[in-house]
Each structure stands twice: as C-alpha cells, then as structure tokens.
C-alpha cells in the first residue's frame, strides 16, 4: 500500500487520491469523516479494517504527517532555564555580594564573584538543560499510549506515533490518542468536557452517518467520532484515525491557547462583583508569587526549597552579625565592614549545592530508566528513600499476568483439568482430563483421584451450555498468523489476560469465539466494572431467534444475581441433570465451598450464569433487570503464577523495614494463597492470635465496615485485602498515614487515580495501566513488575544517602568557614580593622571550585551492600547529619585557626599590617605575615575539605576500613575503596595539587587571593590536615561505640528471630485461640 501522502503540505489534498465526492471534504480539504461510511473512510486512508496499516506504511505516514503532538507545548524554554538558574536564593546572595563589592570599588573581589556566578549559572544551565531533555524523554515514555492494529497484530505504541489510517482500540480509562472514526464499539461513552464543555459522558454510535450535507453537525453531536484527549468513561471501541496533532479538534483549541500562560493571579469573582479587597488580594498574591519565584522558595523540589530558605536565613544572619561585631559598636559601617560581611556571608552559603543537587537527580532519573522505572516528578526521588509501606496490586505486578485456565467445575458433571500447558495462547497445547467429582470432594477425600484422560463423549449438555457462555461472555480473540521474522505460524491473542485464558480453554474444545459468533447477533454488553465485578453480554441466536444473557464475574457477585441452578450430587444419579432447581442458601454455601477448594490452590475463580429473555419488551439497556434471575452454570479456576523474582523481592522489602500489603480484587482464598506463596503472609498462621490473623487478611467489605477509630485499634493493618475497591485503597492509605507511615501505592485503572494521588509515591503500571492512572502517578513501571518497585526504592535510598553525603560535606565546610571568619574578627590590624583569616576569593575557591566536583562525585557513589537492610529515612536533615556537620565543621575551623595563629603569633609580637583586606592596597612587605598565614590556612582548609569528602563516603566506618568484611590488609583495602569511585579519587587528587599554583602564581596570589608564597608553613598545613583526619576518625570511632551499645540493648532472642521472620512481631505464644479455629489456618 502506498502512503496517504507524499509531503506534509499535501496532507489534506485527498481529492486527487480517492474516489469520493468532493462534498465529503471540508473547505480546507480535510475529510469530513462523520459524513462517510466506514468503508469510505477506510478507502480514503488506504487502511485495512482487520489488519490495519503495514509497518512500512505507518513509518512513511509518520514521516509525512509528523508526530502526533500538539506542537511545542513541551518544548524546553531556554529563557526559563536561565531564569531558574538566576532566581534562587543562593545565586542571588552571590549576585548581591558581587554588586556590593563593585559598589565599594573592590574590583577584583567583585570580578571573581561575578565569574563564580557565571560559572554557576553556566554549569547549572547545561545540567538543567540536559535534565529537562532527560525528563522530557522520560515523560514521553510514560505519556499516553495507544493500542493499534498493524500487520494484523495488536501492539501498544506511544500516542505520538499514531498516524492517520491506524486502527486504534480504546477502552475504559484510556485517553483517546487522536480523532477517530469509530468502526466498532460496545457501550462506548467518552468524556468530552475538555472539548465541548459537556459535563455528562457522550454515548457513541459507530453506525450513524450524517450524509445530509445541507445540515451542519456540531462537533459534540458527531456521535460516530471519538476525539483526541477525551477519556473513555465506559465501554470499548475501535476506530480509524482521521486526524492527528494540531489537525485534531483539540489541536485547534491548543493553537488558540498558545501564549496564554500568566503569572498574574485572577481576581476572585465567585461572590459576584469583586470588591477592592479581592483586587488587593490578587495584587498582593501576584507580588508575593513573583518575589518567591525570584528567590526560588516556591519552585523546585522540597529539598531545593529548604536550601533556598536556608540560604536566605544564613545570609541575613551573617550580615547583621558582621555589621554588629565590626561596625555598629564603633559607628563605623564602612567599606571594610561591607567586605567582611560579604566574606562571612559567602562562607555560609553552599553555592554549589543547587547545581550538585540538580545533576544528582538528573543522573538518578536516568539510572531509574535502566531499572524499568520512569520518574515523572522529581519530588518522588526524594520520597522513595523514605518508603516503609507498599500497597501493591496482585495481577501482573506480583504475578506474571499470563493466565492459564487450570480447572473447571460443572455441577452434576464434574471437574475438568488442564495439564501440561504453559503456553497462555496456544489452544492446541496441553491435555484436558476429567473426573466426575467436585473440587470440594477432591480436596476432602484422602484417596488419590484418577483424572480420566478421555473426555466424556458427547459432551454433557450442561457442559455445552457452560462452554457457550464462557465463549460469548468474552471479547478476547485468538488467531494464528505467520511471524514476520521466523516465518512460523504462531498463536496470538487480543484482549484481557483473564478472558484470553477462558477463550483458549473453550477453543481447546472447539468452542472458539470465531466459529460461534457468526451464528449470533450481539445486542448489548455490560462491561466489567470494579465496583460490581462482573460483565454480561446479550446475544440473539440467528437460527432460533432466542435471546440469552451470558454473565461471568466474581463468584459471590454472580451468585447474588442467580435464583436457579441444576443442582449437584456426588453420584451418577443426577449426572447432567436438566431440571432446574431453586438456588437455596445451602446450595450457595456448597458452591462457595467448591470455590474455596479451587482458590486455596492459588486459582482465581470466576462464576458463569445465563438466562433466556422471553419478554420482547424488556429494556436491554437496564443492567439491573438483565442481570437478575440468572441460572448458575459453573466455575473456572485460572492460575496466574507469581513472578519468579517476587518472593525474593518481598523478602528484601521485609529486610529493608518495608511492609508489603496486597490489595487485590481476587477472592480471599486466592489472595491468601498467593500472598503466602510470595511471603506477604506467613505460612503457619497458627503461630498468631485469632485477632491478628483476622486483621492480617480481610475483605474490602470487612475493612470498609470499620470506623477510623476501629481501624486504628487493629493490632496490625491488613497485609491482604481481597475484593478490594478503589475507595478501600484510599482508606488504607489514610490508615497508614495515621500510623505515621510513608506509603507507595500501585495502580493501573482509572479508578485508582485517587489512591495514587493520596499516596506519598503513586506508582502506575506502564504496560497495562490506563492513561489516567499514569497521569496521576509519580513514577511509572515499564515492566509492571513488583521487583522494579524495590529497585526504585533502592535507587531512591542510594540517592538520599548520597545527597546526605554531599550536603554534609558542603555544609560542614560552610560551618568551618563561618566559625573561622567570625573568630577572625578578633584579629585587629594597625588601622583598627579586623583582618580576614581567609579572603573572599579564597572562600569562593574552596566552596565552588575545590568542593563542587567532589560533591558531584559523592552524588554518584554506589549503594552500600546493606542499604536495603537500613531503616527507611524520609528526611535528609537528620539529627545525625546535623551533629556531624557541626562536629566536622568545628574541628576543621579549629585546625585552620590554630594553623593561622601559630604562623602569625608564633614568632612573637605579630604585625598584621594595614589594609591587608584590599587587593588595591595590598603590599607584600606590609602584609607578608598575614599573607603567609592565609596561604597556610587556605591550604589546610582546602585539604581538610577534600579529606572530608572521603570521610563522608560512610557515616560510621573508618576511611581505612570502609568494608568490614574483607581479607585484605588495611592499606590495600583503603586503596581499593578510594579507587572504587574513580571520579571522586581524581577530584580529590587534583584538588590537593591545585593548591600549589594558586599559592605561587605571581599577581594571582597577592592581588586576587590576597595571600603569598610560603615555605615551612607547608609542614603546618600538612600536619593540621592529618590532625583533622585523626579527629574525624576519632569521631567515627565514638559513633561506632555508641552504635554498638545501642545495638546491644536491642539484641535479644526475639529480636534475632524477628530479623529472620518479619512476622515475629505479630506472634502469639498462646496458640489455643487460633488452633481452635481451623478456618483461620492454612
């Protein structure tokens, strides 16, 4: 097939290419698809309704029409990135300092500060630009997807790759990826409020054709079209793409909305005509927003905002401190005071922190992609490290999502078993065997049951009727096609995994949907709904004209609709009985006991029912009447095996201090069996009290019936909630929050969006998740795998740990410099002014140049081996970090101060010169002693800062014993550990060496850095650097002693058992209550 067009400019010129009347085209040459039949639209777009476009056809059309996006709405704004670099408190402090320095004609300090500002902005710009590109590509991975048919195969592609002519399938929760001419649907309704303003969903009809060209049809009345960006609120449908990107109806609106963003707050007009107060409130709010945006305290991640507030607080605190100490008592607020205020303020501002944080998060987001995790919101990177409870769905997340029908029970017939089949799509694989006993009887008997290899022939009538219901209450399809790569015939399936499993089972017995559907007319369908957990289809036989309802769903929900069945006895007297019996409560208990027998095997059990419709006047749109007075037919047990890695991941979560909760729509028995198999529930429930066992596994009805106070009094929140509804998930999150938990919640359906937003971290499924769920989530799993959640948490903890490391390193240096400079106020020269023990340029060099690169490299440290065995931590600024920051900073300041004092005062009466704080008046002879002291203390502080970077790798372990479990001698292990992060190694090494040229290069040393060459002072700098290292090691040794004492207090037999058994804390050593209740035991 040829492409629709040869270039974009001709994409609307269909007149020369199709055999259709010109009246079917609008004024601009685009197709008015709502006025055409399905066949005409398919011909215009040169597509096949069954097989869709070919791959080559789709690729060429994509080149011709471009990507299916609304233009450059997500285009990276270079202006905004630059503004973001300038408008944060830390950069603004540097800019203010630069302006002050230039205003008092300290040109060199002002120029150096300006250069540092330029470097910060440049590095920040490059990194944020890269981060924006990375996040843009990640957002495109998690953006709405479309399920299309190409080459006869159903495949999921990014919505932006959809092209005109594609056959697109939509279902509940999907965002329509493009404008569609509907060709097939069932109870399809879409929410078009975004487009038309209509608050109610619009019911679609693909058979409508508006061929009267004299009557204009408004957009909202074109019921045979589905529009891009509308959300499917009910049913399902299939359509041909007729417009993409800006050619869609929503695209036309997008054009008109361009450049309509405003930072101006709107005036509140909700109470009628606004008064002066409303205008004043809007004006003041606008000014506040602009001011806060400039300072960067209401943009960025929570940590970035905290750092901006910290910068503002420290800057003004230091300013007033310096003014008071150096100027106000003497009424001498002059240039010297201003310069010293600048110097101290700079020493307190971690100038490189924002840049380092941005780079770390951008790299972390890229690492997440390799672990099948897409980060949609950077805030979630900070939150992941603090997760201590995960609420996960079962199907497809904890399990493989590849369902295979294993057992079927037909009352008064027996149990059918499928064996030797692990191919979920191939109806020819495996063997179906039979025994005329119920699952309950098989479970209770001690005898070995011999399943017959031959099926009853002919099939019992009740089994035939059940097969018919299983086939028709099902929209999954199977087909065999030739694989393009291997050329072999392979089985392919389209539809829901559960329905595919049922369809494969019926096809094994020659009851495939394709062979039966041509004999029936599909009259109505009521799709599966998570609130009622069943679906029904209404068909009319073309041979007998008989109308029948076919229903399947959760056993208890289907039984509630049933009034009759054919009975059941464990003997041959009523074999294949055709006489209807009223369904009594005892009968329902019997059916439920058979369901339990299947569910305890880990099978997901569904029930089937049917009824004849004899009243021709019945309303086929009334679901309640259609699904009433049904005849129960039988059960099917579907096995969805756990993923091989799930059990190990759950165990790792328990070791990491993370509780795992399964919130599933399955039957309690199935949920409990799978939960025990993967380790969410303990196997031996008799170890626990009756109260705890009841709380561990509950149904949604039981949980929802409890008040908040009753939930809070439970000994443990449920580890498994079966038959879970969307509102149950929200209540579970609220209950966890009340217990101070930090919660991650998984979801895939449109109804999961409230719980995803409520959770601290919302996790959507990338493969089977709806677009609405993805949009509400913080992260998206590209493989729908529970193990990927653990990977995300591990990476989140690594990032949080690394952020703590470089925050500690940078802020400890700030503390050291601030203390050092504040004490330096005591050094008075001959003019009565304080002498800087460090010059402003030295301060900036240490903070920005020397420390920035080691900090960035600390951000890339590998996770420690035991990171998942540590307790969750939801904050960066822990008391341990704060105390470490003060201790390291204080000790560094002491080392530098003593070094300076020894040099200046060691030779007797010191001479601190005159105006040694100004580059313009510096004199090497007058200020020689001060310059030598500065050089030595500068070298000491630089080397101490670099040593601190290595010390921050591990909060407790010695620099010489980073890894305790090694057979290497200490010196060899130290080399291995330091070389492990080669970027950090070379940053530190180059930082050590860089001190020498800065001290010795003429002009730069005396005019810029305000220090001079030194000799024996190098020995002092080396000695005090080693002293700092020794003090740091001593502090870590004290911390290790304290930690060991704390652990000894915690160590006892129960503690050790709890480490190996995460459920030990729930154990009751009085087992009588539970053992007296067999139904609580497994």
Curated annotation (Swiss-Prot):
Binding site for ATP: 395, 499, 552, 604, 664-666, 723, 729, 751
Primary localisation category: membrane
Domain of life: Eukaryota
Disruption phenotype: Decreases the rate of potassium efflux from the cell. Sensitive to high pH.
Ranges of the Cytoplasmic topological domain: 1-75, 120-308, 358-807, 854-884, 957-983, 1029-1082
GO molecular function terms listed in the Swiss-Prot or TrEMBL record: ATP binding; ATP hydrolysis activity; metal ion binding; P-type potassium:proton transporter activity
Expression induction: Induced by high pH. Not induced in response to sodium ions.
Pfam families named in the record: Cation_ATPase, Cation_ATPase_C, Cation_ATPase_N, E1-E2_ATPase, Hydrolase
Keyword Cytoplasm: no
Residues noted as binding Mg(2+) in the record, renumbered to the chain: 393, 395, 748
Reaction catalyzed: Na(+)(in) + ATP + H2O = Na(+)(out) + ADP + phosphate + H(+); K(+)(in) + ATP + H2O = K(+)(out) + ADP + phosphate + H(+)
Extracellular-side segments: 97-98, 330-336, 829-832, 906-935, 1005-1007
Keywords for the protein's UniProt record, in alphabetical order: ATP-binding, Cell membrane, Ion transport, Magnesium, Membrane, Metal-binding, Nucleotide-binding, Potassium, Potassium transport, Sodium, Sodium transport, Translocase, Transmembrane, Transmembrane helix, Transport
Intracellular or extracellular location(s): Cell membrane
Cofactor(s) annotated in UniProt: Mg(2+)
Topology with respect to the bilayer: Multi-pass membrane protein
UniProt entry tagged with the keyword Transport: yes
One GO BP: intracellular pH reduction
Leading EC class: translocase
Family: Belongs to the cation transport ATPase (P-type) (TC 3.A.3) family. Type IID subfamily.
Cited function: Catalyzes the hydrolysis of ATP coupled with the export of sodium and potassium from the cell. May be an inefficient sodium exporter. May transport other cations such as lithium. Sodium/potassium efflux ATPases are involved in salt tolerance and maintaining the membrane potential across the plasma membrane in high salinity (Na+) or alkaline (K+) environments.
Protein's name in the database: Sodium/potassium exporting P-type ATPase 2
Organism: Schwanniomyces occidentalis (Yeast)
High-level lineage: Eukaryota, Fungi, Dikarya, Ascomycota, Saccharomycotina
